[in-house]
């Protein structure tokens, strides 16, 4: 078994899917967390100067959330049985990641961390309140566009009563939990029209390989 070290800020954010996959698979790893004010110590050691990054045996540093997640899912049996399974899992994951991406920009902008580069159609003269409102609206538009599609996609398999791929939890189901956790905590009403997705979210949380992790993980606000 390789020696893994996962680098990310002290929050769930874009790294939580990687942590959850390793927890579900029983993979041991070092969870290297740091605060925002410590980022300069690590930035230049990261391949693309961003995190999360997964270090493997101190020799390979793998960047990008979904590249790491797919690697871990393939290694541990959470990525389907054939190419068509993987295709379906991929597009479901990519849809959830769109929501996570826009939510994280909104969350950090409203907390004063992102003041630049949040959209190519934004005016550089936009004040912080306008910027936050713009990014929030974009996030909500993404939710409306994607969640209805994912609700229908889930329903295609056994009426949406199990997981996206049937009776076995896969990467895309864990993405549902990780990508919607903070948005649901912030405003549950955004998701009231998607009961099958909300039931899936609860199924993942109650899965015997996930519940112990959720109980013992670090308690952070994002």
Swiss-Prot record:
Residues 82-222 form the GST C-terminal domain. This is S-crystallin SL20-1. InterPro entries: Glutathione-S-Trfase_C-like, Glutathione-S-Trfase_C_sf, Glutathione_S-Trfase, Glutathione_S-Trfase_N, GST_C, GST_superfamily, S-crystallin, Thioredoxin-like_sf. Residues 2-80 form the GST N-terminal domain. Gene3D superfamilies: 1.20.1050.10, Glutaredoxin (3.40.30.10). It holds the Pfam family GST_C_3. The keyword ATP-binding does not apply. S-crystallins are structural components of squids and octopi eye lens. Contains relatively little if any GST activity. Belongs to the GST superfamily. It comes from Nototodarus sloanii (Wellington flying squid). GO terms for biological process: glutathione metabolic process. CDD domains: GST_C_Sigma_like, GST_N_Sigma_like. Lens. GO terms for molecular function: glutathione transferase activity; structural constituent of eye lens. It comes from the Eukaryota. Keywords: Eye lens protein. PANTHER family: GLUTATHIONE S-TRANSFERASE.
């Amino acid at each position: 078994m390789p020696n893994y070290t996962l680098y990310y800020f002290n929050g769930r954010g874009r790294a939580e899917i990687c942590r959850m996959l390793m927890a579900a698979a029983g993979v041991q790893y070092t969870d290297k967390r740091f605060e925002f004010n410590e980022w300069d110590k690590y930035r230049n050691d990261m391949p693309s100067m961003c995190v999360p990054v997964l270090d493997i045996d101190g020799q390979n540093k793998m960047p990008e959330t979904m590249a790491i997640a797919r690697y871990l899912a393939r290694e541990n049996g959470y990525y389907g049985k054939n190419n068509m399974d993987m295709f379906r899992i991929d597009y479901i994951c990519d849809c959830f990641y769109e929501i996570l991406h826009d939510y994280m920009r909104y969350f950090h902008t409203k907390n004063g961390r992102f003041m630049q580069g949040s959209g190519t159609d934004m005016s550089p003269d936009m004040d912080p309140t306008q910027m936050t409102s713009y990014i929030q609206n974009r996030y909500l538009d993404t939710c409306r566009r994607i969640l209805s599609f994912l609700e229908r996609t889930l329903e295609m398999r056994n009426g949406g009563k199990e997981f996206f791929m049937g009776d076995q939890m896969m990467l895309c189901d864990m993405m549902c939990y990780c990508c919607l956790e903070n948005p649901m905590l912030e405003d549950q009403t955004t998701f009231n029209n998607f009961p099958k997705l909300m039931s899936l979210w609860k199924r993942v949380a109650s899965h015997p390989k996930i519940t112990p992790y959720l109980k013992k993980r670090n308690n952070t606000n994002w």
